[in-house]
């Protein structure tokens, strides 16, 4: 009996092993995990070698956690949660942390490099000394020869054969010659293609002078413009003797006078340094930033509130109209009213931009014929804001209308029948029955719509580009700019350079403001529901 049981269990075990397909085997799983680990390690090493330490660390953490979750049976339950958590961390938390970190630095178009990299760029600069020779590049078997010509007396120098395959700096001796090369010289295209190799070529004259490529047709005597001081930080100008020190407050190498005071002269490129709360203080105290920031913040709030109000009002009224039982052809009206929602928003915005054209737009042509007026839609702040609200209402009402059409189906007909028996009219039914029953379920969606319009970058960028521009501001700002558009213009359109640190500080303030407004809206909606 026991033998039969053992034989049966052995048979069942064999059959279960046979049922496991090859793509479900542990060997294949570990092979895939091993290959993924090797590929990830390769990517991390590349990121680290290129100086992208932060991205390398984030990639290492996410992939390591992912491999542990999907390879360990104890973490089986986390397999369903980890992709969402990793995505939120990578696309929400990581950019947020980076933005906040940049807000405390002077990171900009003039201060993008690290200190070591900026110092290296400055040390690589050369200045021209001595004579300038024209050159020609001539083939010699499988190598090349460099022929230098002195433009003053026509004397010739020819180099020993060299190859472009050498790495690093390559020194070649040149000797005087009375015979010019008779072979065909290399074309400008070949010289351009080999410019990097020629730039690392050093031609040494018989007197020991060193010549380097200074243009596509010339070799000149050059020397490093700056040399490094004994402390490893000071830079000394070889032409003027001026000494420069790294200024940790500005992120530039600046000249220092005899008293040890900083002078205005500074060297570019600069380097990134931590400046604490200076960017935030600029927003709060610099009048050139404070005035447009406050004005833009107020307009952003008004735009968001009015956009939600208008879209809900128009959408709710149209939903009630197309749901009216006595209306004939309701299906046609529904399709026509929903069409704006089917057209991509950026196409509609550009169409409206043409319609509102002040000189040739159809809207101004019609207003001119009917009323004799031509509003300045793009040059007057009030009319520009009115135009934006009109276009945004057109873009947003179909969504609210669809929601209201669905919610109207949930209202019992008994309520309207009872109100009809009491002698109530359509307006009383709307304000006493329909509106109160629709507004509560719409509240969360209205909050979401408010948050969306608060950061409605595309509408402003395509329709007005923030214009008309404000006068007397230290940063680019317009009357129709939202906070997100203002941040974009500070970061990428500044006349004095792209100030990413200031833009990150404004973006951080926007994040705090939107979060605070969302909390207030949620609390208010909770009180209404209670």
From Swiss-Prot:
ABC transmembrane type-1 domain sequence ranges: 297-521
Role description: Part of the ABC transporter complex MalEFGK involved in maltose/maltodextrin import. Probably responsible for the translocation of the substrate across the membrane.
Topological domain ranges for the Periplasmic compartment: 50-52, 106-295, 353-385, 452-499
Membrane keyword on record: yes
Complex formation: The complex is composed of two ATP-binding proteins (MalK), two transmembrane proteins (MalG and MalF) and a solute-binding protein (MalE).
The entry's keywords: Cell inner membrane, Cell membrane, Membrane, Sugar transport, Transmembrane, Transmembrane helix, Transport
Side Cytoplasmic, residues: 1-26, 71-82, 319-330, 409-428, 523-530
Topology of this chain in the membrane: Multi-pass membrane protein
Single biological process term from Gene Ontology: maltodextrin transmembrane transport
Localization, UniProt: Cell inner membrane
Listed Pfam families: BPD_transp_1 (PF00528), MalF_N_TM (PF20872), MalF_P2 (PF14785)
Any one Gene Ontology cellular component term annotated for this protein: maltose transport complex
Protein name: Maltose/maltodextrin transport system permease protein MalF
Principal location class: membrane
GO MF assignments: ABC-type maltose transporter activity
Protein's organism: Yersinia pestis
NCBIfam families per UniProt: PRK10999.1
Matching CDD domains: TM_PBP2 (cd06261)
Family: Belongs to the binding-protein-dependent transport system permease family. MalFG subfamily.
Entry annotated with the keyword Aminoacyl-tRNA synthetase: no
InterPro entries in the cross-refs: MalF_N (IPR035277), MalF_N_TM (IPR048464), MalF_P2 (IPR029345), MalF_P2_sf (IPR047103), MetI-like (IPR000515), MetI-like_sf (IPR035906)
């Amino acid at each position: 009996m026991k033998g039969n049981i053992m034989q049966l269990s052995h048979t069942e075990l064999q059959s279960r092993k046979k049922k496991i397909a090859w793509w479900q085997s542990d060997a294949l799983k570990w092979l895939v995990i091993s290959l993924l680990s090797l590929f990830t390690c390769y990517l991390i090493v590349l990121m680290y070698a290129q100086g992208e330490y932060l991205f390398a660390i984030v990639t290492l953490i996410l992939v390591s956690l992912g491999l542990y979750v999907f390879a360990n049976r104890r973490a089986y339950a986390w397999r369903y949660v980890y992709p969402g958590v990793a995505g939120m961390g990578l696309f929400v938390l990581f950019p947020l942390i980076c933005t906040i970190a940049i807000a405390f630095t002077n990171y900009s178009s003039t201060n993008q490099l690290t200190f070591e990299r900026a110092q290296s760029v400055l040390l690589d600069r050369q200045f021209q000394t001595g004579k300038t020779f024209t050159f020609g590049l001539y083939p010699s078997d499988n190598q090349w020869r460099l022929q230098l010509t002195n433009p003053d007396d026509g004397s010739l120098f020819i180099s020993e054969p060299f190859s472009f395959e050498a790495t690093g700096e390559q020194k070649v001796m040149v000797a005087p010659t009375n015979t010019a090369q008779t072979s065909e010289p290399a074309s400008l295209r070949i010289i351009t293609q080999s410019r990097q190799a020629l730039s690392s070529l050093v031609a040494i004259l018989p007197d020991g002078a060193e010549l380097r490529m200074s243009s596509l047709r010339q070799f000149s005597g050059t020397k490093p413009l700056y040399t490094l001081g004994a402390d490893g930080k000071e830079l000394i100008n070889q032409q003027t003797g001026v000494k420069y020190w790294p200024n940790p407050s500005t992120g530039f190498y600046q000249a220092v006078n005899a008293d040890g005071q900083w002078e205005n002269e500074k060297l570019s490129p600069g380097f990134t340094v931590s400046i604490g709360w200076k960017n935030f203080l600029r927003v709060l105290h610099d009048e050139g930033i404070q005035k447009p920031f406050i004005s833009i913040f107020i307009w952003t709030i008004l735009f968001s509130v009015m956009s939600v109000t208008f879209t809900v009002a128009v959408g709710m009224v149209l939903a009630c109209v197309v749901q009216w039982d006595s209306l004939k052809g309701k299906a046609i009206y529904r399709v026509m009213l929903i069409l704006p929602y089917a057209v991509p928003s950026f196409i509609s915005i550009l169409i409206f931009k043409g319609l509102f054209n002040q000189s040739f737009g159809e809207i101004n042509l019609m207003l001119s014929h009917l009323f004799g007026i031509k509003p300045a839609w793009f040059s007057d702040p009030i009319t520009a804001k009115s135009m934006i609200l009109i276009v945004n209402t057109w873009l947003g009402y179909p969504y609210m209308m669809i929601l209201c059409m669905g919610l109207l189906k949930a209202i019992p007909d008994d309520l309207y029948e009872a109100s009809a028996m009491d002698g109530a009219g359509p307006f009383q039914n709307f304000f006493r029955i329909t509106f109160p029953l629709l507004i509560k379920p719409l509240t969360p969606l209205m909050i979401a719509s408010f948050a969306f319009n608060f950061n409605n970058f595309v509408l402003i960028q395509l329709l007005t580009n923030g214009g008309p521009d404000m006068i007397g501001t230290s940063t680019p700002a317009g009357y129709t700019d939202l906070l997100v558009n203002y941040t974009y213009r500070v970061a990428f359109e500044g006349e004095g350079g792209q100030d990413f640190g200031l833009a990150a500080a404004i973006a951080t303030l926007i994040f705090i403001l939107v979060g605070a407004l969302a909390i207030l809206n949620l609390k208010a909606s909770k009180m209404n529901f209670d």
